[in-house]
Design a protein with these regions (language model features):
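Long, low-complexity, polar/charged, intrinsically disordered or flexibly structured peripheral segments
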Residues: 184-213
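Structured, hydrophobic secondary-structure cores that serve as assembly/anchoring elements
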Residues: 1-111, 126-128, 138-143, 220-477
Length: 477
């Protein structure tokens, strides 16, 4: 920096390799389901339930997504990616009359709660110009008419291929697209107010497993989360009243969660009303996955007129985020300060002998009748009691291992750009050791013992992106 001038601000660039591995990143959840409005197959980061309501329309009887998001924030969650999926939902249609035709616009986001209106004017356009026009688009809140979003496009033309063609310009709009051929002449100016849809949007049909799963090639359904760098918890709320995701959706979600290093939360089927039904259901299903958390029973709301049992997958996701923030993923959920909502009670009483049988099958138990003391007990994954993945039958062990592997993965990606393999190995080993020391000091390991080994050698060749660097970790959670 020149001695002649010092603005009092010094900017220093710090390479990723100089940054410590983050041991305290906020746990992030992802929910996939049906909503009243909002972008389709696009992960949207939501930090409050009010924000969810503004973007996706809030709670809705046709979907459990809104209730799950509300549970999530009520129980300590702070950030969740929401992916809206739909089954043949349609956007509202607006028609702008023109001298010899009509300009048809279709709302980008489908749904009955997506209210779009439009106005046409010729302000700032010479009187002898009969081609240019201005377009004002607004998204308004249902009922109140409050303007939520507004887009203004000036000096548009109808003729395709020309500069400022309405068809080309509206490709960038987040509200509408041009549908069908455009008229030869510009649309007529709106006399007063705005033009409302001639055809309202629709919410489509109930979701199928294929809507939830989506397409890897198209980035739809759960694969829309490929746009997100990292998720810790994945949850598919029941797609409709009295339903849970089917086998195809569960299998796809299991595989996706495993690939992303995330934990999948599964709600129990509503048909499970007794302990023996849950045990039989688990054995018949044959689920054995260390990356899946499930529970039994569902809950009921104290003093509510509702007679049905509710899923609490959203609440459990929130509790996991709260647990990680306050204690760490190596701790159990069954402890003070991590109870379910005071109004939630187990749908059925679970005796201690039955609880043992449920845990043996890999189901965590919702237990406790005292207000404010309904807990998630068991700390098991669906690998419990099986030969496959039995080392990760413990929920705390599996979550700690996922946290360690994900943090190291994110914190060492710079190594592929290293030209000196020996230096990269040494730096990685040092950083990982420091990271494990932080976890050890926080109480993550029994007896504070752990081992870090990074493959050694004096090779000066660049790191092979295909082979990578071998890192061996040993610890006792």
């Amino acid at each position: 920096m020149s001695d002649a001038y010092d603005g009092g601000i010094t900017v220093t660039e710090s390479a990723p390799m100089d940054q410590p591995i983050d041991a305290s990143a906020e746990t992030t959840a992802a929910f996939v389901g049906r909503a009243l409005r909002g972008p389709l197959d696009t992960p949207v980061l939501v930090r409050t339930f009010a924000e969810f309501g503004r973007r996706f329309g809030g709670a809705w009887p046709g979907s459990n997504l809104g209730g799950a998001v509300e549970q999530f924030f009520e129980h300590g969650g702070r950030q969740v990616y929401v992916v809206r999926v739909a089954n043949n939902a349609r956007g509202a249609m607006l028609c702008l009359p023109a001298p010899n035709g009509v300009l048809v616009l279709r709302a980008v986001e489908p749904g009955s709660a997506e209210h779009i209106r439009v106005a046409v004017d010729y302000d700032g356009i010479p009187d002898d110009d009969e081609e240019l026009f201005n377009l004002t688009l607004q998204r308004v809140a249902p009922g109140s008419g409050l303007v939520l979003d507004q887009e203004i496009y000036r000096r548009l033309v109808c003729e395709p291929g020309r500069d400022r063609s309405v068809e080309d310009v509206l490709v960038t709009s987040s509200l509408v697209r041009v549908q069908g051929p455009v008229p030869e002449h510009r649309p007529l100016a709106t006399d007063a107010g705005y033009i409302d849809p001639v055809q309202p949007g629709t919410d489509g049909q109930p979701l199928s497993d294929y809507d939830l799963v989506g397409s890897s090639a198209d980035g739809t359904g759960i694969f829309a989360l490929n746009q997100v760098e990292h998720i810790d918890v994945l949850y598919l709320p029941p797609p409709g009243p009295g339903r849970v995701p089917g086998p195809a959706a569960v299998l796809a979600a299991e595989l996706y969660a495993r690939r992303r290093g995330a934990l999948l939360i599964l709600d129990p089927p509503i048909e499970w009303k007794r302990t023996y039904e849950a045990i039989k259901g688990m054995r018949d299903a044959g689920y054995a996955n260390p990356d899946v958390l499930s529970y039994f029973p569902r809950v009921k709301v104290r003093h509510s007129e509702e007679t049905g049992a509710l899923p609490v997958g959203g609440a459990i996701a929130g509790l996991l985020c709260k647990l990680d923030r306050l204690h760490g993923p190596w701790e159990d959920l069954d402890q003070r300060g991590l109870a379910l909502n005071r109004d939630y009670v187990p749908a059925i009483d679970i005796f201690s002998s039955d609880a043992h049988l449920l845990v043996k099958e890999g189901l965590n138990v919702i237990a406790g009748q005292n207000p404010g003391h309904t807990m998630v007990c068991g700390s098991v994954t669906l690998a419990h009691g099986t030969q496959s993945g039995d080392e990760f039958a413990s929920l705390t062990t599996r979550r700690l291992c996922l946290m360690i592997s994900n943090a190291i993965d994110r914190g060492t990606r710079w190594a592929v750009f290293e030209t000196d393999a020996a230096a990269a190995r040494e730096r990685i080993g040092r950083k990982v050791h420091a990271f494990m020391c932080v976890l050890s000091d926080a109480g993550a390991f029994k007896n504070d013992k752990f081992v870090v080994q990074c493959d050694t050698g004096q090779s000066r060749k660049p790191v092979d992106p295909e082979r990578g660097i071998t890192l061996l970790l040993a610890c006792h959670p």
